[in-house]
Amino acid sequence: MRLVFVGPPGAGKGTQAKLLCDKWGIPQIATGDMLRAAKATGQLPADLVAQMALGVLVPDEVVVGLIATRSLEADARAGFLLDGFPRTVPQAKALDALLSSRGQALDAVLALEVPRELLLERAVLRRTDKRTGQIYHLKYKPPPPDAELEHRADDQEEVVRTRVETYEQMTTELLPYYEERGLLRRINGVGGVEEITSRILATLPTLPTLPAP
């Protein structure tokens, strides 16, 4: 089972990715985490680290190289779920080439879709407990009275709005690319966690590599 999972910030992608990976026994390969780990262990050249600090996007070949290495590890033999990559058509083609060189291919691309205004509401009312790291929502998951709450910078309305717009711009061509290949599964991301998980699973019954329950 080789999957790509895409969705705007605040769509609940992280929650669903963990549930799916636990169900199928495959790793979640998050490119952001890989880059941070590579930076921390000195695997990236100093000039690239400096560019990352300025917000410059990491070259595709660097990310593909990290994915190539990670996807060969023992826990990824049965497949993996890619989170955060690809974001553009050139990246998608690079991923296709990598998998093709191994005689492999993607099984599906899951696109979690949530209306923009709901994304903003989810993020703007989200709070983090500074002591425990636990995430709460002032409307949907109120914190206990003793929580030491902070409103993270990346949950501010203008920041979230910009991130959502960036996601929409980047996927304008990416989603049609996968749709033309019959790989795209559009998932309604509005509802409870279990409800959304059921929708995802319902889009995948015909995949030949889908593990038995």
Task: Describe the predicted segments one by one.
Residues 1-213:
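Glycine-rich phosphate-binding loop of ATP-dependent small-molecule kinases
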